[in-house]
Curated annotation (Swiss-Prot):
Highest taxon in the source lineage: Archaea
Gene name for this UniProt entry: guaAA
Pfam families: GATase
Function: Catalyzes the synthesis of GMP from XMP.
Gene3D superfamilies listed in its UniProt record: 3.40.50.880
Single GO MF annotation: ATP binding
InterPro entries associated with the record: Class_I_gatase-like, GATASE, GMP_synth_GATase, GMP_synthase_A
The protein's assembly and partners: Heterodimer composed of a glutamine amidotransferase subunit (A) and a GMP-binding subunit (B).
The protein, known as: GMP synthase [glutamine-hydrolyzing] subunit A
Primary enzyme class: ligase
Organism of this sequence: Methanobrevibacter smithii (strain ATCC 35061 / DSM 861 / OCM 144 / PS)
Biochemical pathway: Purine metabolism; GMP biosynthesis; GMP from XMP (L-Gln route): step 1/1
Length: 190
């Protein structure tokens, strides 16, 4: 029942793992260089793709997105990698900084359960998703970014531009708890 946190070399990847551990969610932080077979051997119920400085340093993350049929949550760079893997567009933001942002939750099912209609988050906007792929829908937006969060319409694949693992996102732990519930539900249905 373990969720693997894929370390994309971002400064907060260890905090993602610690946040999950604090919530008593079984987790392991693994490098983004593991092969598909090495990930499969760990038998995860879900993947969280952490943030990182660049797509070029994302290792095998895009392969994981394309290969695995388990719940996936992409955070910041992970969010952008999901968009890229499915054919969305990523580009430089108009505001290249970290900022406290109020997001508007437009779909509060599953990942945002219990959090609507608005949520204060800590978000990085150096790069962002400019257009979502086919078969995706927007879950949240803000005055800085049209795509703060999205999900696949048929798969348990989610992306968020912001960082739920930092204290600047006061209700970030609820995102992780909701994702764990998605993973457990999926595991029980398979």
């Amino acid at each position: 029942m373990t969720i693997l946190v894929i370390n994309n070399k971002g400064q907060y990847n260890h905090r993602i793992q610690r946040s999950l551990q604090y919530l008593k969610i079984p987790t392991e932080l693994v490098p983004n260089t593991l092969s598909i077979e090495e990930i499969e051997a760990k038998n995860p119920i879900g993947l969280i793709l952490g943030g990182g400085p660049s797509i070029e340093g994302a290792g095998n993350s895009e392969e994981y997105i394309k290969h695995f049929d388990i719940p996936i949550l992409g955070i910041c760079l992970g969010h952008q990698l999901i968009a890229k893997a499915y054919g969305g567009q990523i580009d430089t933001s108009n505001t290249e900084s970290y900022a406290k942002v109020e997001i508007n939750i437009v779909n509060d099912e599953n990942l945002f359960s219990g959090l609507a209609p608005k949520m204060e988050v800590w978000s990085s906007h150096k790069d962002e998703v400019k257009s979502i792929p086919d078969d995706f829908e927007i879950l949240a937006n803000s005055n800085l970014c049209d795509v703060e969060s999205f999900k696949h319409t048929e798969k348990d694949v989610y992306g968020i531009q912001f960082h739920p693992e930092v204290h600047h996102t006061p209700k970030g732990s609820t995102i992780f708890e909701n994702f764990y519930e998605i993973c457990k539900k999926r595991c029980n249905n398979d």
